Amino acid sequence: MSRGAHGIELTSAGKAFLEHARMALLQAEAAKEAALRAAQPARPTFALGFLSGVEIGLLPEVNRVLRDEFPGIEIRLSSDYSPALAKALMRRRLDAAFIRPEEHMGELVCRRVRTDPLIFVFPSDHRLASQVAVAPEEIVNETFYFPSKAAPAVRRAVLEYFNRAGLDLKPEYEVHNVVHAISMITSMRAVMLLPAYTRRYLPESITTRPVKGEVPTLDLVIAYHKSNNSPILKLLLSRVGKLAGAPS
């Protein structure tokens, strides 16, 4: 340290010492943070997928189940079509997913959560709205939209239902998701068969009626890779019965 015309100044040796002191403090702080992290258990994470739309009813209950046992858990959510979620499970990018059963599931294991009935959906002022239930033959002359191939399980259920009813409906018109369905039902006065849980998304201008006679249904399952030994997954699977009672 030296005293000059501009006051006290550090010498070269003093500046070097100060720099070393600053570095030592930074290293000490970093070591302290590392020690604190090491002393704390790793935060558990769980990657969970949902078929688009079903999370509204299931997620609150899933959240309660997991956080009761793992309070600090980080739940990483994904929402997509069932085929995309199944691929993510097979690639181990997801721990579990709520999906429709696919035809080729590979090394995935499924456990049924619930069975969703399909219902007829159409404009509120449609002629079918005067009925308590709708028979399949009553929509023969209507503009009918099918689910697209992006949702193969729903599409297959609808086609098989009409085949059993003896109706040869051709999938000339398709919709890709619930938002698209609402748009087509409203603008084209179309009729559709959709899972009952979609009722929660519909505006007042659209109504629903149950199917008369045999009711087509779709299973919702929780799927996971057979080699996944996660204790979080084990807990979730043990509470499937509780999830079955969640609002659909």
Question: Which residues make up each language-model segment?
Answer:
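Flexible hinge/capping segments at coil-to-helix
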Residues: L108-L118, F122-F144, P231-K234
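A short LG(V/I)-centered, amphipathic sequence patch enriched
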Residues: M1-S12
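Short amphipathic alpha-helical coupling segments at ligand-binding clamshell hinges
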Residues: A13-H20, L58, V62, V154-V158, ...
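Hydrophobic hinge/microswitch elements
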Residues: Y81-A86, M90-L94, I99-R100, A150-R209
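Alpha-helical linker/hinge and terminal dimerization helices associated
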Residues: F17-A39
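Secondary-structure junction motif
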Residues: T143-A165, S230-L237, P247
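Beta-alpha-beta core module
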Residues: G106-R112, D116-P117, E138, V179-S227
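Central regulatory/effector-binding core of bacterial HTH transcription factors
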Residues: R43-M105, V175
